[in-house]
Curated annotation (Swiss-Prot):
Family statement: Belongs to the NqrDE/RnfAE family.
Spans through the membrane: 11-31, 40-60, 77-97, 110-130, 140-160, 176-196
Any single Pfam family the record assigns to this protein: Rnf-Nqr
GO biological process, one term: sodium ion transport
InterPro entries from the UniProt entry: NqrDE/RnfAE (IPR003667), NqrDE/RnfAE_oxidrdctase (IPR050133), NqrE (IPR010967)
Location within or outside the cell: Cell inner membrane
Protein name per Swiss-Prot or TrEMBL: Na(+)-translocating NADH-quinone reductase subunit E
Cellular compartments per GO CC: Gram-negative-bacterium-type cell wall; plasma membrane
Organism: Tolumonas auensis (strain DSM 9187 / NBRC 110442 / TA 4)
Protein keywords: Cell inner membrane, Cell membrane, Ion transport, Membrane, NAD, Sodium, Sodium transport, Translocase, Transmembrane, Transmembrane helix, Transport, Ubiquinone
Function summary: NQR complex catalyzes the reduction of ubiquinone-1 to ubiquinol by two successive reactions, coupled with the transport of Na(+) ions from the cytoplasm to the periplasm. NqrA to NqrE are probably involved in the second step, the conversion of ubisemiquinone to ubiquinol.
Reaction(s) catalysed (UniProt annotation): a ubiquinone + n Na(+)(in) + NADH + H(+) = a ubiquinol + n Na(+)(out) + NAD(+)
Broad EC category: translocase
Major localization listed first in the record, in broad terms: membrane
Length: 198
């Protein structure tokens, strides 16, 4: 149990997908203008990541891994396209759910919801799971933790950007300039966790 707890904490703080690996920056910068929208996208990423990482673990273990289907057959070269297919299917299901039951969030997320399909944070979480050879329970914990890590980062960024609206930012830095500086400072803050060994 302690191993899973340390993996969970490590995936949120020490190996934060947005602020340690800089994955998913496109949507991270574009949707982090309002906390409400950022929280909605963060929850969507947590849901997709929590399902995509374990689902792709099963696909890798029982289909793609060497000797999984047939003795002597190695289908790991199909990994990337298979993982993207699984992620795309999950995002389509989430998109239909939000359109039907939470239309306000669906319209607020706009084009960025389908972009979760190709969000490199989602794909990065799946790739790290395969690379680190996590078993199924570890992949569930890592999927939830890495999704929360990205959601935490985007909500923090949105909260800071909402406060910066009322700040006296120099004209040359307004908009994305100060946002990049803020993201860098946040990354430095999260880098302080890297010295912690769990």
């Amino acid at each position: 149990m302690e191993h899973y707890l340390s993996l969970f904490v490590k995936s949120i703080f020490i190996e934060n997908l947005a602020l340690s690996f800089f994955l998913g920056m496109c949507t991270f910068l574009a949707v982090s203008k309002k906390v409400k929208t950022a929280m909605g996208l963060g929850i969507a990423v947590v849901v997709v990541q929590a399902i995509a990482v374990p689902a792709n673990n099963l696909v890798f273990t029982y289909v793609l891994k060497e000797n999984a289907l047939v003795q002597g057959m190695d289908l790991t070269f199909l990994g990337f396209i298979t993982y993207i297919g699984v992620i795309a299917a999950l995002v389509q299901i989430l998109e239909m759910f939000l359109d039907r039951y939470v239309p306000s969030l669906y319209s607020a997320l706009g084009i960025f919801l389908p972009l979760i399909t190709v969000n490199c944070a989602i794909f990065g979480g799946v790739s790290f799971m395969v690379q680190r050879e996590y078993n199924f329970p570890e992949s569930v914990v890592y999927g939830v933790g890495s999704g929360i890590s990205w959601a935490l980062a985007i909500v923090l960024m949105a909260a800071i950007r909402e406060k910066m609206k009322y700040s006296d930012v120099p004209p040359g830095l307004r908009g994305l300039g100060i946002t990049f500086i803020t993201a860098g400072l946040m990354a430095l803050g999260f880098m302080s966790f890297s010295g912690i060994s769990l």
